Amino acid sequence: ERRQRIDNNPGVILQEMVLSELWKGHPYEITVIGNMDEVAALTPADGMAFYKEYYSPENAILVVAGDVTPEEVRALAEEHYGVIAPTGTAHGERKWAPVPPLTETKELVYSDPKVRQPSWSRYYSGTSETRDRELSYALDVGLEVLGGGMTSRLYQSLVEDQQVAISANTFAWTTLHDEGPALITASPAPGVALEDLEAAVMAEVEKVIDEGFTDAEVERARNKLAAQAIYARDSQSNMANTFGSTLALGGSVDDVLNYPDAMRAITTEQAIAAVREVFGSDRHYIEAHLLPAEGDS
């Protein structure tokens, strides 16, 4: 799985390098999939020990989606899971210090023959719904305006007007338990150097930070995010995953149900304030360049 999903994907390799720096000193620095040396050293006994430690009723959340009643679900749960005895290994909510903010700016470059399209990215220290729900929601709206699609500031400026990029996006990992990165990323148009692309991207970001958003832009972003959350309810499996992950992170059912209204409540001032807080000129970041390299792909 690691060879297929990571080692064979230059973009994911670079991202793994960046996240290791971003989360240095935090448990997130340890990747879930591990490295090849760790995987090769695992034994069946290691797997069984992990299973016994964590795969117990005390550490489980059961989410059932579909045309069923609570009574039917309870009967089925008692039939299939009731025989599984508690193991006494309940871990409860894990608590540790927040992700330490970046204290210096770094640049990482990764080249690979498999790369067909260069890309430029900046990773900033962000936030999460668990750590700061209000800031997280405001950041979601702000990044939607800044780089959330073809109507965003970055796309219109870099792709449509200046034609220095073929893509330009911003997004943040706000659904982790602890602080995830907030990203600005773009791919250059043919013949455009990464340093010229970077200058164009950051000029637009700085313009937004200086001038702010319009009410119309923020209203459009709010409505889009709220609508996406509502349309997602059409998928039973998606809602099961959403409820399960929210509960596992310490959230509630109400957090999921109230999300559309929470998006609509974000003001223009909150949205631009979140962007300024995360992408301000005084904030450190990790810049990542993904480049092609000569050789066999």
PLM region spans:
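Non-catalytic beta-strand/loop surface segments
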Residues: 5-59, 83-130, 144-195, 217-224, ...
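Hydrophobic side chains in well-ordered alpha-helices
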Residues: 73-76, 154, 197
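C-terminal soluble interaction/assembly domains
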Residues: 209, 221, 232, 251-257, ...
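A common structural junction motif
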Residues: 79-88, 202-212
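Zinc-dependent metallopeptidase catalytic helix centered on the HExxH motif
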Residues: 135-137
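Helix N-cap motif at beta-to-alpha junctions
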Residues: 66-71, 190-193
